[in-house]
């Protein structure tokens, strides 16, 4: 618990400073530390009693041997050489006993860690491949969602009887209010979760009948929450294709409009990004994630608010690159900025876990439904911002 508290405090140090909550974090740490000290005090008290008892026994053993042995030597019932030999034997016995006592504390600490490790290792993944699962090969990119319902638990249904077919090479945008089920739908396609009912297939193969690895190899995902490893920019981009050459990495960086930023850094592609990319801006982290997808070059793309952290200028720059990347690939785009998806082949509106509308940008505007309302609201806000 204390280690989690320290990690949380250090990871959120900027947030704590921004809200002037240093005192709150200090109080949380003091509480966690007090709990840690209480548990450790009981442990060390028990170990202290144990070590003291062992030492008392071992020291008493020598005293008893010398006392009784000396008495018997004086009485002539024992030869002094026998007493000396016996004392040496006992001394050789005492040293291993001390080591065993010291080992017991190390063992107690290690055993607690081992129990936690075994508990994690014995946890079975909720999504598993079938014994006879096939490999997904030569993917064209047809996605079929057939009467899919999904709930994270029995009381929290997210999707209700959703059906959708995406043709190979088609670009489909998914919009709707927050919490409507857009991201959940896109997490079901790579089989991060199993559907509660219905089925999802890629190229007419149910994703439950193919290996998860082959699914993930053919799908590229850029999410809102970008995760970067504590490594260099080069290795973070190369994560999309571990055997990529430096030339391929540079090309991907250029397409993602991050190359100039990298070149401006003192160490270029060898720049260390810090834990979770803390040394980079939000836009830079997102563009590195986009560069990974350019490098991976999959037949299916899922862009979950992929440009949410980009400014308007940079977003406009990479929009053309996205159009080139999406050409000939099946692409699903989750977007709140509706201006970025006007050119999608189809736009689907999801609200409360149900598909409410489907059509092109112009068709949905003419319908005057949820999409039209969202579009008008965003336009009004944009005009208001310009007026100010």
What is each stretch, according to the model?
Residues 1-8, 14-63, 106-109, 125-126, ...:
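An intracellular "coupling" helix at the cytosolic face of ABC transporter transmembrane type-1 domains
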Residues 129-130, 134-388:
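ABC-type nucleotide-binding domain
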Residues 1, 8, 59, 99, ...:
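HisKA/DHp dimerization-phosphotransfer core of two-component histidine kinases
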Residues 16, 117, 251-253:
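Helix-loop junctions and hydrophobic alpha-helical segments within the transmembrane domains
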Residues 18-21, 41-45, 49, 76, ...:
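Residue-level signature of the cytosolic catalytic core of signaling kinases
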